Amino acid sequence: GAVSHSQVAVDILKENKIDLQNSRITVVGVNKLNEDILKFLSSKNARNVVVVNRHEEKALAFAAPYGYEVKSLRQSNEWMQNTDVLISATSAPHAIFTKEDFHEKKHILVIDIAFPRDVEEDVAALPWVTLHNIEDIEAYAKQNIRLRYDEVGKAEVIIQEELQKFMKWQSYSLMRD
């Protein structure tokens, strides 16, 4: 299972059975987390991706290798209406999306990887919004780490058993010589 925030975001897309070829995916913020997400989307031939940033010039350079569209954060009324999936990871010191930004139209999946949060907590109460915030993503990653540790314990037991068999075989082999 995924342990990095960008990997968890990708897992959430998979779990929600997002049609990457046809869904309108908006990625907000220019940073390493979102770069990893753009690489994944590009590798899955996601065509309908928009990169949004406060500074359009930065977004243009960021989106260029993938050929994705770019919008300004100030134009959120324009691009939010058509968004099926919103992935946000900015360095803003406060929330940049409120309930008023999520128009009642159709379902939207929101993945907020920012700390502090980019999306106000009360957005989760909107019935047409499915919100995964940084706390959800941290819990998911920690659960996957626990599962990995459990598997390590099982592997260690198997290694010890096989090592015992080998040592027994080796001592038997040496006694025959």
How does the language model describe each region?
Residues 67-82:
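Short acidic low-complexity segments
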Residues 54-55, 75:
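Short beta->alpha hinge that forms the Motif I/post-I loop of the SAM-binding pocket
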Residues 1-6, 10-42, 46-54:
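Glycine-rich adenosine-cofactor-binding loop
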Residues 15, 103-109, 113-177:
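Adenosine-phosphate binding glycine-rich loop
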Residues 56-57, 115:
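Helix N-cap at the beta1-alpha1 junction of Rossmann-like dinucleotide-binding domains, i.e.
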Residues 83, 91-111:
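Rossmann-fold NAD(P) dinucleotide-binding segment
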